[in-house]
Amino acid sequence: MTIKREMRNDKRTAPKAPINENISAREVRLIGADGEQIGIVSIDEALRIADEAKLDLVEISADAQPPVCKVMDYGKHLFEKKKQANEAKKNQKQIQIKEIKFRPGTEEGDYQVKLRNLVRFLSDGDKAKISLRFRGREMAHQELGMELLKRVETDLAEYGTVEQHPKMEGRQLMMVIAPKKKK
């Protein structure tokens, strides 16, 4: 025996405001199409005013006494709200954490290249995670790793601030630097 499931739209939509004949109140506080207060009128009168203007009657605040309704083009209103939400979403900046891996014996040339990449990450507004991995007997000389991370910290002082100070996690020494706030 197979069980049929109803197809449903999985998009999460905000609850729509009651419009026109779906408004259940008998009296409403009416706001005109251009924003002027018309006052408290019966629902029939409000629907007539909206119909004459060839617009919709939309319930703005249902919990007010009496409910507040506005005469507006509901389709245009939904479009504007969706457009504003998309604009706000587009303007959000996702902060990423970029990682650069060092070794206790990182040579000067490699150090400068990695430092240049760290400067670029911080300038772009991303956080930088610096990890220093120890192998084998290098674990006996953890102070070399600490010195290297202190050097990175001083070299990047003008670009960022230390968010997480160096700490050991297993065989790795980790540090996180956040970009400085732009004024």
Swiss-Prot record:
GO terms for biological process: ribosome disassembly. SUPFAM superfamilies: Translation initiation factor IF3, C-terminal domain, Translation initiation factor IF3, N-terminal domain. The keyword RNA-binding does not apply. The keyword Kinase does not apply. It is found in: Cytoplasm. GO terms for cellular component: cytosol; membrane. It comes from the Bacteria. Keywords: Cytoplasm, Initiation factor, Protein biosynthesis. Gene3D superfamilies: Translation initiation factor 3 (IF-3), C-terminal domain (3.30.110.10), Translation initiation factor 3 (IF-3), N-terminal domain (3.10.20.80). GO terms for molecular function: ribosome binding; translation initiation factor activity. InterPro entries: T_IF-3_C_sf (IPR036788), T_IF-3_N_sf (IPR036787), Translation_initiation_fac_3 (IPR001288), Translation_initiation_fac_3_C (IPR019815), Translation_initiation_fac_3_N (IPR019814). Its main location: cytoplasm. Belongs to the IF-3 family. Monomer. IF-3 binds to the 30S ribosomal subunit and shifts the equilibrium between 70S ribosomes and their 50S and 30S subunits in favor of the free subunits, thus enhancing the availability of 30S subunits on which protein synthesis initiation begins. This is Translation initiation factor IF-3. It comes from Pseudomonas entomophila (strain L48).
